[in-house]
Amino acid sequence: LENDVKVNTLNFPQFQRGPNLVTSVINSIIWINKIVKNLEEHKPDAVIVLGGDDFSEYYSGYKIIIRLYQFYKISQKLPVFLIGHTIGPFYSWRKKAFSILMSKCRIVTRDELSFNHCKNDLKVKHVEQGHDLAWFDLPKQSNYLKYKMIKKYGLEENKYITIIPSALVKHYTSNSEDYFNSWKKLIEKLQTEKYQIVLMPHVCSDIKKDDRWAINEIAKRLLSKNNIIFIEGMLLPSECRSILSCGHFSISCRMHSAISSLQTAKPTIALSYSIKYAGVISGDVGMPSLVIDATDEKLWENGIVEIINQKVSHIENNYNEITNSLSKRVDEIKDDENNILNRYADIINENKGRPFSE
């Protein structure tokens, strides 16, 4: 940031859910109005919402309308920029709702699928295609941190496979036993190979089940923990990326851990549960061969382990080609996204806090 840029911490009011739908809607409107007032009092040059999934029905469901209304209200008072987002896909009346309520916002998607959805289906005027922000280097990302992390966990560079399961079991299958047993079978298969296995959490939470819980459930089922490293503590994003960057490849249920691996030119096998994987990994970085659509319950009953093993063979047989392609494409993405962000910085400086007219 420039030296004259002020950084404020905003104390937004806590949303109070009501005892029924009507009360919850009323409380939402009151809450949104308080947020808008809070923002206005600080007189920002812009409101910038950094992506990902804030405007995806995969996570918000019917509640997406509250989020759209929130940014409609903010955009009436201040310029709003959505940078690096997956948009939708929206269906039914929500398509029109997005088109109307977000008409003043400036949107940069993180992939071509979202861009086309905005232009062709949602009829959004002010949208352009960008990239996921995770393609940039992270604060503290360095060779020093890489070697510090592998030393901490007793790892040897390029001699381990990192596995990132997810606590979002229901995104893959309604049967948690199938989910955890599939991971057990996969790990026991990989244990017979020449690599160490590292089980690493990506999302940690003190208030709900997180990836550490998923790792613990897998660990309970393993017949042998030989040659397996369990990372149990919370890690900074740069620490996660350091571990991924020193491994041979990774297998991930979390898209941003998959991106962190790819960002350092290390292959990943991404187990997809939403369209964002197709947009960001298959599309933007051009690696559809590394993505598995893993939302079919029958796969978790029988078949997912074999499909992952086929991807492992694909990586091993094409390792240099994949890593060289990744290195080139990531550099292209960084350059393009830098140009996009610099252009929007100029727009923000010229606009000086005025809301867009349309």
Give the ranges of each region predicted by the language model.
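Active-site anion-handling motifs in enzyme catalytic cores
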Residues: 1-358
